[in-house]
């Protein structure tokens, strides 16, 4: 079963027709009255990145991928929360320092600020990022129509190439 099938079958009814949840199929939560836009993404080692030898590259990939959910909606990200699970081999002082340095560079580049998170010791390496922005309007995925223009930044396929490189 694919992601959208799982969401539709098991979770969409839980949103209780909350219009802000966008039927759980548009990558973000959007509360128009509060101008609040929120996105959450989880990244698992061996699925979303294959090597943690260069934590800087992994952090760049996952943070940029997460905030892109807001950016593609026309929303400027403002805050993010990051949670990580790992063990003594992945959460070494060296790696934690690299993660911190990379987050600092990305914050400066995109004008975003860390606002919280969590760390858990586990044999599985993973990260979850919640991105938060504010806007009175967003671009809805499900409102795309035939003959709409599509704009792409960078090269198509770069995401896949970076995945096999990491």
What is the meaning of each model-derived region?
Residues 1-71, 134-136, 148-149:
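N-terminal glycine-rich phosphate/pyrophosphate-binding loops that anchor nucleotide-derived ligands
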Residues 43, 76-162:
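Glycine-rich anion-binding loops of enzyme active sites
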Residues 164-166:
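Conserved small/polar residues in nucleotide/adenosyl-binding loops
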């Amino acid at each position: 079963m694919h992601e959208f099938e799982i969401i539709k079958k098991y979770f969409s009814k839980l949103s209780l027709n909350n219009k802000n949840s966008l039927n759980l199929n548009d990558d973000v939560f959007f509360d128009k009255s509060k101008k609040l836009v929120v996105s959450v993404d989880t990244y698992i080692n061996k699925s979303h990145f294959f090597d943690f030898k260069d934590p800087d590259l992994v952090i760049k990939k996952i943070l940029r991928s997460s905030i892109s959910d807001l950016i593609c909606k026309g929303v400027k990200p403002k805050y993010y929360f990051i949670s990580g699970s790992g063990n003594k081999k992945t959460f070494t002082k060296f790696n934690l320092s690299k993660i911190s340095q990379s987050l600092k560079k990305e914050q400066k580049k995109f004008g975003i600020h860390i606002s919280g998170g969590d760390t858990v010791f586990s044999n599985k390496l993973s990260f979850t990022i919640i991105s938060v922005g504010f806007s009175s309007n967003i671009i809805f995925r499900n409102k795309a129509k035939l003959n709409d223009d599509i704009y792409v930044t960078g090269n198509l396929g770069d995401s896949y190439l970076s995945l096999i490189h990491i």
